[in-house]
C-alpha cells in the first residue's frame, strides 16, 4: 500500500520547507509514502530548497512552467503511482508525524474510493484558527456552497483514471467541481474520518481573491447543478458544528501545531 502526497508550488521559498518536513518526517515515510512535488518554474529559491531535500530523501519532483494550479495538480496525478493521492500544497502541512500511519488499516482495506477528514485553517496574520469539517455524508446542498478540503482528502488513483482530473480552465473552483461530480453524480464510495489530517494556511489565491472566487462560484452554481438539485438545496439547511465543539478543536489544533513546529525546528 502506497500513499502519494502531491505538493504544488510556485515562488514559495518561505513556505515550502515546512510542507516538505511534515511529509518526510512521517513515521511511515520510507515504507508507505511517495512524495511528488510540482514546481511551476519558480524564480525564487523554491527549487533550491526542494533539491536540498530531494538529495536526502526519495522525492520525485519537476520544475517547469504550467498553465495554473490545476494544470500542476493534474501533472502530479500523472507522476504518482500510489494507491491513494493526497494534495498538500506549499504552506500546508500534516498535523503530526503519525497521521498517515493512523489511517493504514483504512487504506489497506481498499474499501473506499475517497477518504476525507478534517483540517484546521489558520490565518497567518492573526494566528486565529478555524475548524474545517464536513458532514459524514456530504450531499448536494453541501457542495453548492462548500467542498472537501483537498489537504485532508485521499483519492484512489483509479478515480482519476476513471473519471478524469481537475478542470484546468478555472483558478479556484475546480476542487468543488471534481468533488461534487464524484460524490453526487458518480456516487463513488466515500468514508469520513473524524480526525484532523492537516493545517491549511489561509493565504492562497482561493482565500484572498474574493472577487475571482465569487465569479467562478457563480459559474459553478449555474452550470453544474440540475434544476432538481437546486430544489433539494433550497429545501435543506446546512448544519454547522456546535460552538463548543469548534472551541475544543481549535484548542487541540494549537497544541498539535506547536508540537509540529518544535519537531521541525529540532529536525524530528
Identify what each model region corresponds to.
Residues 97-129:
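Conserved donor NDP-sugar-binding/catalytic core segment of glycosyltransferases
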Residues 45, 71, 92-106:
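Acidic donor-binding/catalytic loop of UDP-sugar-dependent glycosyltransferases
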Residues 38-48, 89:
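A conserved acidic beta->alpha catalytic loop
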Residues 85:
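Short aromatic/hydrophobic "clamp" motif used to bind/position activated sugar donors
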Residues 31-41, 62-65:
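Short beta-strand/loop segment that forms part of the nucleotide-sugar
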Residues 63-80:
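Glycine-rich, basic loop-to-helix element that forms the pyrophosphate-binding segment
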Residues 12-26:
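Short, well-formed alpha-helical segments that are part of the catalytic scaffolds
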Residues 131-220:
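Conserved nucleotide-sugar donor-binding catalytic segment
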Amino acid at each position: 500500500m502506497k500513499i502519494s502526497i502531491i505538493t504544488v508550488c510556485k515562488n514559495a521559498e518561505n513556505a515550502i520547507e515546512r510542507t516538505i518536513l511534515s511529509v518526510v518526517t512521517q513515521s511511515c515515510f520510507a515504507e508507505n509514502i511517495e512524495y511528488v512535488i510540482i514546481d511551476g518554474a519558480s524564480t525564487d529559491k523554491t527549487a533550491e530548497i526542494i533539491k536540498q531535500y530531494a538529495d536526502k530523501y526519495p522525492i520525485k519532483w519537476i520544475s517547469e512552467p504550467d498553465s495554473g494550479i490545476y494544470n500542476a495538480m493534474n501533472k502530479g496525478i500523472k507522476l504518482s503511482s500510489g494507491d491513494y493521492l493526497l494534495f498538500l500544497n506549499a504552506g500546508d502541512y500534516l498535523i503530526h508525524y503519525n497521521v498517515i500511519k493512523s489511517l493504514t488499516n483504512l487504506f489497506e482495506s481498499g474499501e473506499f474510493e475517497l477518504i476525507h477528514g478534517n483540517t484546521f485553517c489558520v490565518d497567518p496574520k492573526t494566528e486565529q484558527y478555524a475548524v474545517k469539517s464536513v458532514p459524514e455524508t456530504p450531499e448536494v446542498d453541501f457542495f453548492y456552497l462548500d467542498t472537501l478540503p483537498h489537504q485532508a482528502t485521499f483519492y484512489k488513483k483509479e478515480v482519476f483514471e476513471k473519471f478524469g482530473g481537475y478542470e484546468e480552465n478555472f483558478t479556484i473552483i475546480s476542487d468543488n467541481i471534481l468533488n461534487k461530480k464524484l460524490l453526487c453524480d458518480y456516487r463513488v464510495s466515500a468514508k469520513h474520518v473524524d480526525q484532523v489530517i492537516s493545517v491549511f494556511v489561509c493565504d492562497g489565491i482561493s482565500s484572498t481573491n474574493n472577487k475571482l472566487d465569487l465569479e467562478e462560484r457563480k459559474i459553478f452554481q449555474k452550470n453544474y447543478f440540475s434544476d432538481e438539485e437546486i430544489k433539494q438545496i433550497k429545501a435543506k439547511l446546512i448544519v454547522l458544528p456546535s460552538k463548543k465543539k469548534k472551541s475544543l478543536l481549535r484548542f487541540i489544533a494549537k497544541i498539535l501545531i506547536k508540537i509540529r513546529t518544535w519537531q521541525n525546528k529540532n529536525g524530528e
